[in-house]
Amino acid sequence: MLNQIKQDAQDRMTKSIDALRNSLASVRTGRASPSLLDGIKIKAYGTDTPLNQVASISVSEGRSLVITVFDKNMSKDVEKAIYASDLGLTPTVVGTLIRLNLPPLTEERRKELTKVVHSEGEDTKVAIRNIRRDANQQIKDMLKSKEITEDEVRHGEEDIQKLTDKAIKSVDEVVKSKEQELMTV
């Protein structure tokens, strides 16, 4: 039972870190990346559809993205969705091709994005600490119901703390890496 609590905590911490990585992938750096457009949804076929399901996205020349829309009737919808997103990009439409040129980030915008990255990292750390708290509470509940001894509680809490420290270190590395990527001109 104790091992199951540890495994559950580790799985939840890993999912939190993965969610942070996915979230940071959509933060715009100076380089073009198809993941930049992951959050864009298009009204297609009666529902909100992710852009990557109605078009292919590729990188061209490092600082531009080329979107090839599968259905040429959807080009206008894709263009509107890009304008509506908060990415600040201006699409150039030529038939089923949409080109997005990414202007270099200003120093001010880089600093703003660094703050956003740092904030998301802190939110993830809070989530990890909450997972630790939940796991420790489950361990204490097991002690109350006399399923485990005091020594097992102490060892269990130490193991959970080690998992937490490892996860927080991983979050710090992810955030630092993204901040370096942002500050590289």
From Swiss-Prot:
SUPFAM superfamilies: Ribosome recycling factor, RRF (SSF55194). It is found in: Cytoplasm. Transmembrane segments: none annotated. Pfam families: RRF. GO terms for biological process: cytoplasmic translational termination. InterPro entries: Ribosome_recyc_fac, Ribosome_recyc_fac_dom, RRF_sf. Keywords: Cytoplasm, Protein biosynthesis. GO terms for cellular component: cytosol. GO terms for molecular function: ribosomal large subunit binding. It comes from the Bacteria. Its main location: cytoplasm. Responsible for the release of ribosomes from messenger RNA at the termination of protein biosynthesis. May increase the efficiency of translation by recycling ribosomes from one round of translation to another. Belongs to the RRF family. This is Ribosome-recycling factor.
